[in-house]
């Protein structure tokens, strides 16, 4: 047996302790580093922030006062024809308060009546601008996993109304201290801003205020097999640049069954039109006009989260820059809205006729070669019209841009109809193509053979049975408090 001196024993024992102890310390350090890199858990339940941020929470909750449902199809039945074959022909209401974002996407006929998680018609992407649960699911499961599957799959997960964690890093020390802690909660929005050379983390506070709004108030499309959200900004954010992008990738939202034109549907390009308008050009942010600083009962200033019409808080919004009185500015805006609306209706009349005349041309025996340039004009005209009207505040944000877009839309629609006259004549049709009665929403939908009673009944069954199940599952899992 080899004898070891006491001194050598102490050296060996110390070395062993250092070796194994150091390993434990390294493991602990690695674990801490991993925890630091892990994204913070996102709290999607908005009422959890009522106590630390009472004024902001109360004003956010007050968006429920903006409850009016305004049926855009009933107001303008031409839209039914322009969106024939697309879900918007079933149902399209004007926007209302943020408190209703989740309710409205559940209740609209556009999302159908899926009775099972795998049922259609819409993809998961249709939740993307409706709830902070979207950011939570992306953080927990990854972006690809979030987008996979149909809209109904997300029902038990996406259960809290659009709120705090959509725009703020609610887990940060800054937010706890009462600072804005603005962040982009949608990774696809961050990528889009990078594409136009405006990375969020390098932007100033004013730019970031508009960027967080621009996560949702933008044009987007569903890309690839899993229908992931992408902003079409690779070539820029103007109507012409986005049109060129879509044409370059041969993207089509749907084919209008009347004309067989491959159509594009603009969503709500508020960020793009604001950016092009006088307010955006002068760095007046969305927050400056729609979320002003106001005083609470104790005289303390806070940012109102009752996002709405700037005229409702005139002294805190418009008055900070403009010298005119409220009535004068309201008249100016009303006149701009009237000007935009007049040309909008002219474009719609031309496009409605173009779709029906194209249908007649096909029926008369027109060839694809004859129709291709006509369908391109219809596609481009309606895209420019839609880009104008889908941005609901364009008459305020960028009226000159809206008028230019509508002017080019009118030209292209008229050009399509001029070509259609020749094609129809070549195939023996010399009389005017008759139009069905589309003077009301119901008549327009009837002209397309839409069974609205069936759609409505199926939706009501869905709301009465499936939605309560979603909410019960969410409460059971702790994702919904009430």
Swiss-Prot record:
Pfam families: Cytochrom_C552
UniProt: heme binding residues: 126, 129-130
Superkingdom in the source lineage: Bacteria
Signal peptide: 1-26
DNA damage recorded as keyword: no
Family per similarity comment: Belongs to the cytochrome c-552 family.
HAMAP family linked to this entry: Cytochrom_C552 (MF_01182)
Name the record gives this protein: Cytochrome c-552
Lineage: Bacteria, Pseudomonadati, Pseudomonadota, Gammaproteobacteria, Enterobacterales
């Amino acid at each position: 047996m080899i004898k070891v001196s006491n001194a050598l024993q102490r050296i060996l024992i110390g070395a062993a302790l250092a070796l194994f102890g150091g390993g434990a310390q390294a493991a602990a350090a690695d674990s801490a580093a991993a925890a630091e890199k892990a994204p913070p858990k996102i709290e999607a339940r908005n009422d959890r922030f009522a106590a630390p941020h009472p004024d902001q929470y109360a004003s956010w909750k007050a968006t429920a006062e903006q409850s009016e449902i305004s049926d855009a199809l009933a107001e303008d039945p031409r839209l039914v024809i322009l969106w024939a074959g697309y879900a918007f022909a079933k149902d399209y209401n004007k926007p209302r308060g943020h408190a209703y974002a989740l309710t409205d996407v559940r209740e609209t006929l556009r999302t159908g009546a899926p009775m099972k998680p795998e049922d259609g018609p819409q993809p998961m992407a249709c939740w993307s601008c409706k709830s902070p649960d979207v950011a939570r699911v992306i953080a927990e499961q990854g972006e690809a996993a979030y987008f996979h599957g149909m809209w109904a799959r997300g029902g038990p997960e996406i259960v809290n109304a659009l709120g705090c964690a959509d725009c703020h890093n609610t887990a940060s020390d800054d937010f706890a201290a009462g600072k804005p802690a603005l962040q982009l909660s949608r990774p696809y929005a961050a990528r889009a801003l990078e594409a136009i050379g405006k990375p969020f983390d390098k932007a100033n506070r004013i730019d970031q205020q508009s960027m967080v709004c621009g996560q949702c108030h933008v044009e987007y499309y569903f890309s690839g097999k899993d229908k992931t959200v992408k902003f079409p900004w690779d070539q820029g954010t103007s109507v012409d640049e986005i049109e060129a992008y879509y044409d370059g990738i041969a993207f089509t939202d749907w084919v209008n069954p009347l004309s067989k034109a491959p159509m594009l549907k603009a969503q709500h390009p508020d960020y793009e039109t604001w950016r092009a308008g006088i307010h955006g050009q002068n760095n007046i942010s969305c927050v400056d006009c729609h979320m002003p600083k106001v005083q609470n009962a104790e005289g303390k200033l806070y940012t109102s989260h009752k996002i709405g019409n700037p005229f409702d808080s005139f002294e805190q919004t418009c008055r900070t820059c403009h010298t005119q009185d409220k009535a004068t500015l309201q008249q100016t805006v009303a006149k701009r809205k009237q000007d935009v609306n007049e040309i909008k209706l002219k474009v719609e009349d031309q496009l409605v006729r173009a779709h029906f005349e194209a249908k007649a041309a096909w029926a008369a025996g027109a060839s694809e070669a004859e129709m291709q340039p006509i369908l391109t004009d219809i596609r481009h005209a309606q895209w420019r019209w839609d880009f104008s009207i889908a941005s609901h505040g364009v008459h305020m944000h960028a009226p000159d841009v809206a008028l230019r877009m509508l002017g080019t839309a009118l030209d292209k629609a008229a050009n399509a109809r001029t070509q259609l006259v020749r094609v129809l004549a070549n195939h023996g049709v010399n009389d005017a193509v008759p139009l069905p009665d589309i003077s009301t929403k119901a008549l327009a939908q009837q002209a397309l053979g839409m069974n609205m009673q069936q759609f409505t009944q199926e939706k009501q069954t869905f709301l009465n049975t499936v939605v309560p199940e979603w909410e019960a599952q969410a409460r059971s899992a702790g994702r919904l408090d009430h």
